Amino acid sequence: MSNTQSFFSQPLAERDALVRGALSKELERQQSQVELIASENIVSRAVLEAQGSVLTNKYAEGYPGKRYYGGCKFADEVESLAIERVKQLFNAGFANVQPHSGAQANGSVMLALTKPGDTVLGMSLDAGGHLTHGAKPALSGKWFNAVQYGVNRESMLIDYDQVEALAKEHKPSLIIAGFSAYPRQLDFARFRAIADSVGAKLMVDMAHIAGVIAAGRHSNPVDYAHVVTSTTHKTLRGPRGGFVLTNHEEIAKKINSAVFPGLQGGPLMHVIAAKAVAFGEAMTSDFRTYIDNVLANAKALGEVLKEGGVDLVTGGTDNHLLLVDLRPKGLKGTQVEQALERAGITCNKNGIPFDTEKPTITSGIRLGAPAATTRGFGVAEFREIGRLILEVFEALRANPEGDAVTEQRVRQQIFALCDRFPIY
């Protein structure tokens, strides 16, 4: 076999055994562990196939019909499919599907609608917001006068009166509604009224709840915001990437220029193909049933944890995630994250509102239902997972360094559970 022939035919296992080995171990991890990280999901075989397609080879700077490279006929076809599907999915007039991530989508809005030094009002990272909403370490916190709103100390719900007061005091150019760790619905109408009262643009970052919105189970922010951003993974169950929506033609033109050439060069056409597939999947009745199951499973998990004496921030959830306050159990986020992983359950440590622990330690964990629901888990399985989590909690209280016997017993039960619901 010639070198050229082998280049196109030699499988990964032969060409690079080290990478193949790591991928095989990662597949085994995903198959045998329960994934409760709220921002993660499991994509379909079709999405994987599209992302691993020959579009990996294609440069396509520009937009459909207006490329800076030749040979883009089929790239145009794929991107146009993605655009039309996401517009239909969220009833939006305009869409840009090229952002490589949610952070890039948010950055493109800031580039399009603000200038360095402007005031931006977003949710504090400490209260459940996202880095890109004005956190000090992020570009949005360095290039802008970032003012942050939070939650009520008693209810742990967004303090809309505070949002309004801060908006009137600081006169932001942009108000951001969205979160990375907030378990309740957002009042988009209230946010828009506040934005209008000070002449600000409203951006909704729906990354975490895009799938819930697509299924019609939460209100659609496109009806309220000047511009909406999102990731394509999480509850939308697509590849890792981003997109931007708006109903305003002038804003759409600015967004397109901000994405390319403002922030990015060539789009990742293989990822856009996978986005198109995921958008198509999200338009089905099966997807709506899936989201209903996600919401039911998250509630069931929360109920079991509360029955076991665990505090939930806001007392429960309206969406796919739970924010668990570990302080009543005398535990730390890092400690619990590590113990649960040893027991076959992956989650992430997470700060809670008014947390006094360092971000590397935290007083909480974040749990989510999307990935385990994708593999077929229902309410019964999530209640079982909740009971197993409580076992690990109690073992940690008795032995803060970890209880190997309990963790191994739980891991065996988790493995048996996963074996009943195989993936790939």
From Swiss-Prot:
Its EC number is 2.1.2.1. It comes from Cupriavidus pinatubonensis (strain JMP 134 / LMG 1197) (Cupriavidus necator (strain JMP 134)). This is Serine hydroxymethyltransferase 2. Belongs to the SHMT family. PROSITE patterns: SHMT (PS00096). It catalyses: (6R)-5,10-methylene-5,6,7,8-tetrahydrofolate + glycine + H2O = (6S)-5,6,7,8-tetrahydrofolate + L-serine. Its cofactor is pyridoxal 5'-phosphate. The record marks 233 as: Plays an important role in substrate specificity. Its main location: cytoplasm. Homodimer. Gene3D superfamilies: Aspartate Aminotransferase, domain 1, Type I PLP-dependent aspartate aminotransferase-like (Major domain). The keyword Calcium does not apply. One of its GO terms (biological process) is tetrahydrofolate interconversion. It is an enzyme of class 2 (transferase). GO terms for cellular component: cytosol. The modification N6-(pyridoxal phosphate)lysine is found at residue 234. The keyword Lipoprotein does not apply. GO terms for molecular function: glycine hydroxymethyltransferase activity; pyridoxal phosphate binding. It is found in: Cytoplasm. SUPFAM superfamilies: PLP-dependent transferases. It holds the Pfam family SHMT.
